[in-house]
Amino acid sequence: MNYDLRQMATFGVAGNFTGHLEQAGEAKDFKNITTKDENAPKAIFLIYLPIKNNSIPTFLLTFPFDSKKIVFPKNEENLQIEPECAIVCNVIWNNDKIENIHPIAFAASNDCSIRKDGAKKISQKKNWGNSSKGI
C-alpha cells in the first residue's frame, strides 16, 4: 500500500517515553502541564501541514520527509537523532471533533531534532526544511 505523505498532516508527541523530555533538555517547556500519570506524554504538536493558508507559519508547509537522506541545517550543530515509529491513521470526524482514529500503516522514522535554545515552539525544532526527517 502506498500513501502520499505530502497530503497528510504530521504530528509529534512530546514526551512519548518516560524521561525523554528531561534527556532532551525540554522538561522546563512543559512544567505547567499536569497529567494523571507524571510519565504521560505532555503535548501533541504539528510538524507538517499540507494546507496553504496565510495564518500557518511557513516552516510547517515544508515537507520534511526523505527516505534516503537527512540534510543537516546550516549553522546548527546540536542535532539529536531520534528513532521513532511513524503511524499513518484514518481520522474519523464528527463536525469539528475527532470521533475516532484508526491506525492503518506504520514505518520506522528518524525524528531528527535541533536542540535549539530560544525556540518558541517544539515544532520549530522538528521541521527545518526538506529532508529533515527520515522515513
Features from the language model and the residues they span:
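Glycine-enriched loop-and-adjacent helix/strand subsegments that border the catalytic/binding cleft
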Residues: 5-135
